[in-house]
Amino acid sequence: MDVVGLFVLHFLRVLTVFVSFKGKGNMIQQDFRTKVGNTVFGVRATALILQNRKLLVTKDKDKYYTIGGAIQVNEKTEEAVVREVGEELGVKAQAGPLAFVVENRFEQDGVSYHNIEFHYLVDLLGDAPLTMQEDEKRQPCEWIDLDRLEDIQLVPAFLKTALPDWDGQLRHIHLEE
């Protein structure tokens, strides 16, 4: 097992699991997430959906995001990213190569976050929708040319340069806001 895998295993062993209810009948989703003081720790998987050198993103307010979300208990990261694409886009998908493992620390709305993120290249097995649905929230989807990523407020911002320059090798990235 490589260093990143060992780190993730150690992280998951000490991680407390919170149960989050997402309003889907009686189904309980257990996400890897815990809060210590004012810091929320979590493990996420995101989809880098590319076609013709364009990235599929969703827009919320003035920011753009890739599709993805929390990994659930006993779920492989590549299963999580496929599940998230299905839940949010309503399209079947297939996980491709893992491109980035990111340790992302940032603050949002007065809360500190420390996420371990797995960013996979993902192939859609159907047409991309015009909107994304997360719980009760609908957001528009857009294809953004990789050469234009620098012109938008993409979250996480490292993708603006790392994705167009990606050489096919797994990269481990540390981000701190």
Across the structure, where does each feature detected by a protein language model lie?
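Short hydrophobic targeting helices and cationic amphipathic motifs
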Residues: 12-15
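Acidic, metal-coordinating catalytic segment for phosphate/diphosphate chemistry
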Residues: 18-21, 25-46
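Conserved Nudix-box catalytic region and its N-terminal flanking loop in Nudix hydrolases
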Residues: 50-87
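A short coil-to-beta-strand element that immediately follows conserved catalytic motifs
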Residues: 92-101
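Active-site-adjacent beta-strand/loop module that shapes the phosphate/pyrophosphate-binding cleft
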Residues: 106-130
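NUDIX/MutT-family hydrolases
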Residues: 121, 132-165
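Acidic/histidine-enriched, glycine/proline-rich intrinsically disordered or flexible terminal extensions
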Residues: 165-177
